[in-house]
């Protein structure tokens, strides 16, 4: 018997996740000084995290030999105040929202259960569902309507075997929100768990924030993260908001110390620094407007509307996104080609906000390439 013989067959079907490229990788591969590389590929906060976090981490260094506080009590309290939800309705993940996604699949899915996922969307949903034995039923965001959710494609896939439905809003990579009316229609049509991924909700209009619906409906779980506006992508902190019973079941199987001491302190400090948070929201909206207005000037591109810190862009001159992104990489600009997103043709790339100076330089380089 070989190693291949003892590996689960479902694992062999997967391809390794391809993340956005790092500055270090581009510097090595293209011989470009890391200081000159503009990273606009991973939907990060270009202004970083609160400067107060660095001070808090220095104070925490003397405690790194101790395990973190297992119940995350102080952090739960700060999150509770931030979103207006009781602590008992919050579950924290130490690998970002990915941990919450994986743990909810662990408590829900038996072999043969069904999960509905509209595409194109975040790829981790399907990976977590499949590895736990789920059958994926694909719904769709309609390209002909600027990727508006085709709600009937979701409703028509619901069966007695449906255990969960993933709704990413605002959606990654398309940037648009799902209407509250459509989400309500889906929630009220099934007892399956509706996973509302709000990773980018801080950039959206307030009326699209459905976090409170996790208290209103028993079959709703809302995902949130510290990776975007809070600038803590490197610390991998996410959380879910749902009913107390689901939190209890997830607490039974989640890793005990998955959130490090450094991550706890970082998240607590970030939530307390409201001035920095609000500044990042304002600058993020200004930055995406700068990018949107600049890219709209190129007739060879279709720029889709967004409620996030990134734009989905379609190349209309016949060049595929891999070729286009390779040209940008050689000039020191990282954007994300969308080949890995199920349901998208090979002519799309995603570009996320930079500082205003980075955006300006990116648009200059785009002019050199396109015109």
Curated annotation (Swiss-Prot):
Annotated organism of origin: Methanococcus vannielii (strain ATCC 35089 / DSM 1224 / JCM 13029 / OCM 148 / SB)
Catalytic activity of the protein: L-histidinol phosphate + 2-oxoglutarate = 3-(imidazol-4-yl)-2-oxopropyl phosphate + L-glutamate
Cofactor: pyridoxal 5'-phosphate
Keyword terms of this UniProt record: Amino-acid biosynthesis, Aminotransferase, Histidine biosynthesis, Pyridoxal phosphate, Transferase
UniProt-recorded name of the protein: Histidinol-phosphate aminotransferase
Broad EC category: transferase
Pathway: Amino-acid biosynthesis; L-histidine biosynthesis; L-histidine from 5-phospho-alpha-D-ribose 1-diphosphate: step 7/9
CDD domains, sorted: AAT_like (cd00609)
EC number per UniProt: 2.6.1.9
Residue(s) carrying N6-(pyridoxal phosphate)lysine: 228
């Amino acid at each position: 018997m070989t190693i291949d013989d003892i590996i689960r067959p479902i694992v062999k079907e997967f391809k390794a996740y391809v993340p956005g490229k790092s500055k270090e990788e581009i510097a090595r591969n293209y011989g470009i000084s890391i200081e000159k590389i503009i990273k606009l590929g991973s939907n990060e906060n270009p202004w970083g995290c609160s400067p107060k976090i660095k001070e808090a981490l220095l104070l925490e260094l003397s405690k790194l030999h101790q395990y973190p506080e297992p119940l995350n009590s102080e952090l739960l309290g700060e999150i509770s105040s931030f979103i207006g939800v009781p602590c008992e309705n919050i579950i924290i993940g130490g690998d970002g929202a990915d941990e919450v996604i994986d743990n909810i699949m662990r408590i829900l899915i038996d072999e043969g259960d069904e999960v509905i996922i509209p595409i194109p969307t975040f790829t981790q949903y399907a990976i977590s569902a499949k590895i736990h034995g789920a059958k994926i039923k694909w719904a769709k965001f309609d390209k002909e309507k600027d990727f508006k959710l085709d709600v009937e494609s979701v409703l028509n896939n619901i069966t007695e075997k449906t255990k969960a439905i993933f709704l990413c809003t605002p959606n990654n990579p398309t940037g648009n929100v799902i209407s509250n009316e459509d989400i309500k229609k889906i929630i009220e049509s099934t007892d399956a768990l509706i996973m509302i991924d709000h990773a980018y909700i801080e950039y959206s209009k307030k009326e699209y924030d459905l976090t409170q619906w996790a208290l209103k409906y028993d079959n709703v779980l809302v995902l949130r993260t510290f990776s975007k506006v809070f600038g803590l992508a490197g610390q991998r902190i996410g959380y879910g908001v749902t009913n107390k019973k689901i939190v209890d079941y997830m607490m039974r199987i989640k890793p005990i110390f998955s959130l490090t001491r450094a991550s706890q302190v970082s998240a607590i400090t970030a939530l307390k620094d409201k001035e920095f948070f609000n500044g990042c929201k304002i600058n993020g909206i200004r930055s995406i407007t700068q990018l949107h207005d600049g890219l709209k000037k190129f007739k060879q591109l279709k720029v889709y509307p967004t409620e996030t810190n990134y734009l989905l862009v379609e190349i209309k001159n016949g060049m595929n996104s891999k070729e286009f992104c390779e040209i940008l990489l050689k000039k020191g600009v990282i954007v994300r080609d969308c080949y890995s997103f199920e349901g998208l043709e090979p002519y799309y790339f995603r570009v996320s906000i930079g500082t205003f100076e980075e955006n300006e330089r990116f648009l200059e380089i785009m002019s050199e390439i396109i015109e």
